[in-house]
């Protein structure tokens, strides 16, 4: 099984491709997509899409593992991160790849055994589990490798991404959620 882990960001996007054969893990590629600070957000999203598409072409992963959005006090940052995630999701769907999403605490727990682990602890354990010396930098790279490892260690146990209108087993789609919980929806354009 080959998994592409992605740590999405609007300035740096980390990626890591890991192959699992039995109990052995091999890093096929890892790195960071550095986005030019003067580029527009749309140009950055395009760059992320193109560079990850090249990684997918070169290494043919069967699955993309992606970190979910954590809640942020900065709405602009959360929106930009959501748009980057959308580009990664669109790429995975366009290439007919499985897509699994993991919360940051779930990734940390899978890699270190502690959901509140620091980035340094995650980097140390990722490097140790994958026999990487030196530890890849920046943390975006080890985070992406950790996301891929989480998926492999969990056996791809996450339910594949569902499109709008479909629900996960026992869950609900976004439209169902909005209908059932209107008070939870942020109204951007109120009269």
Curated annotation (Swiss-Prot):
Cell location: Cytoplasm
Repressor among keywords: no
Chief localization: cytoplasm
EC number: 3.1.21.10
SUPFAM superfamilies: Ribonuclease H-like (SSF53098)
Keywords: Cytoplasm, DNA damage, DNA recombination, DNA repair, DNA-binding, Endonuclease, Hydrolase, Magnesium, Metal-binding, Nuclease
Needed co-factor(s): Mg(2+)
A Pfam family hit: RuvC
Root EC class: hydrolase
Annotated positions binding Mg(2+) 2: 67
GO cellular component terms attached to this protein's record: cytoplasm; Holliday junction resolvase complex
HAMAP family, per database record: RuvC
Entry protein name: Crossover junction endodeoxyribonuclease RuvC
Lineage, broadest ranks: Bacteria, Pseudomonadati, Chlorobiota, Chlorobiia, Chlorobiales
